[in-house]
Amino acid sequence: EPTLCGLPFFQRVLALQKQYAGGKQIHNAFQTNGILLNDDWCRFFRENGWLVGVSLDGPADLHDTYRVNRSGKPTHHKVMKTIDMLVQHQVEFNLMVVVNRHNSQHPQRLYRYLQDLGTPFLQFIPLVERDECGNLSAESVTEQAWGSFLNGVFDIWVREDIGRVYVQLF
């Protein structure tokens, strides 16, 4: 999680980029779970034109299946607060969904939820982890479930959102 480095670290990164860019334009992107973002971070992103990727695995019941804090408490409400802040500060952002065994069973519901949030940029990546024996972990999405998930999302996207919502894989 890059926010653990603190905002001063990224302010320094930006200063070094300006110092050494030699007139070249640099585009910065920042992927985060969103938990530690605040108004200062949002102002920094807006003022410096950074694209922010926020990890959101669906509505609360889908997201909070695996996205909990160190105490095991759900994080969906904090991510939604972050999204509201990004919108308020007019920061360009996209949503990245880690597709796992649980949320892969709900492609239409998940996509509709993301549609309602209004961001035109979406990414889906499969969770594929292996246990010590080389077998897929219990949380991982199988290849069949991943394919079905993408088909379900694509069916809605191609009918309703083509040219309006950009899904990285389509």
Model region roles, listed by residue range:
Residues 65-77, 84, 88-170:
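Radical SAM enzyme [4Fe-4S]-AdoMet core and its adjacent flexible, acidic
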